[in-house]
A protein has these predicted regions:
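A cross-family phosphate/adenosyl-ligand binding-site feature
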Residues: 1-74, 80, 87-90, 148
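YjeF_N-associated NAD(P)HX repair module
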Residues: 69-203
Length: 204
């Protein structure tokens, strides 16, 4: 978990996972002073539930993380979110490289840590996710490499965005998926052949 809103989502996820009976540990990297009110509230709730939180601030804690990763079945990545841009700080870079080296399934919240949500760019390294759970709408960075190759299976959670916002003309991005492609392809008769479908000239 990081100290931004993505970390707040991580604390909230921990609460729900604990309620489902899962054993878990949270390793925190960042600065508590940067907590938003929502992140602070979720962190406090997790503490009251007795869930372990370890701050990655000493060699001993890093060693504990390494051991915990060896025995973990899955890693939930809530270090960096859609607001990330620029270069990774060295401790975060070290964390991402460590998690990737373990080969454990990673579930990233919103976008794999280290991927720029608007472009899919990666400055140095980024989390290799098996699954990415994003909210509201997919991000451009989920579909442009190298971000696309790091996203894994993409799940989009409906959080009730107003339909008016989704219909804004200022939203210029359109995702060509199977459903949209089906509407664009005309129905063809069973006896169709190459001479009855028109001609295409490609200039490249």
């Amino acid at each position: 978990a990081g100290s931004g809103n993505n970390g707040g989502d991580e604390f909230a996820a921990a609460r729900h996972l604990a309620n489902l009976g899962m054993r878990l540990k949270i390793f925190f990297i960042g600065d508590v002073a940067h907590f938003s009110p929502a992140t602070a509230a979720n962190c406090e709730t997790v503490k009251k539930m007795g869930i372990e939180i370890h701050e990655l601030a000493s060699d001993r804690t890093w060693d504990r993380l390494t051991v915990s990763l060896r025995f973990a079945d899955v890693v939930v990545d809530g270090v960096l979110g859609t607001g990330f841009a620029g270069e990774l700080r060295k401790p975060v870079l070290r964390l991402i490289e460590l998690v990737n080296s373990m080969g454990k399934p990673v579930v990233s919240i919103d976008i794999p840590s280290g991927v720029a949500a608007d472009t899919g760019a990666v400055s140095t390294v980024a989390m290799q996710a098996a699954v990415t759970l994003t909210f509201g709408l997919p991000k451009v960075g989920h579909f442009l490499c190298p971000g696309a190759a790091l996203t894994g299976k993409l799940l989009v959670d409906d959080i009730g965005l107003p339909l008016q916002l989704l219909e804004e003309k200022s939203m210029r991005q359109v995702l060509l998926d199977d459903a949209l492609a089906t509407t664009l392809l005309p129905l063809r008769p069973l006896d169709v052949h190459k001479g009855s479908c028109g001609h295409v000239l490609v200039v490249a």
